[in-house]
């Protein structure tokens, strides 16, 4: 593939799937600056991965795989996972969708940020409607393990919501 062809494919992929990059950067970056850096790192890795895409899965699945692997590697390399979580309200400028200002969406993103790396990845994939099979392929887990983890995530989020509603938060 020539550089021109790679750039064309990359441009089409980014235009069609940039929301994935934003979501992953938002979920794994702890500050606005981190999220911007991570977004750029993910975009760079997507560009590098264009030649490796064989069409064995959907482009969306491929981009998610690249984005999540890049975020996990970046997080470990930068040591961001050891730092305290910061408030996500300062990051709304990163997302351009009007739904980003929905308090329910903000609540779910805050709770997702508190999850460990694998569960955070599963929660993002679940919100985007991926099947257990697709999630297992992206993350290298068995489908049954994905199902168990998703059920635990849902139960934990439901319990947290019930607690906050009970406490009047």
Give the location of each predicted region.
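Short amphipathic alpha helix immediately N-terminal
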Residues: 114-134
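Acidic, proline/glycine-rich intrinsically disordered inter-domain spacer in sigma factors
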Residues: 8, 77, 81-83, 89-113
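Structural recognition of an alpha-helix C-terminal capping motif at a helix-to-coil junction
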Residues: 37-44, 48, 57-69
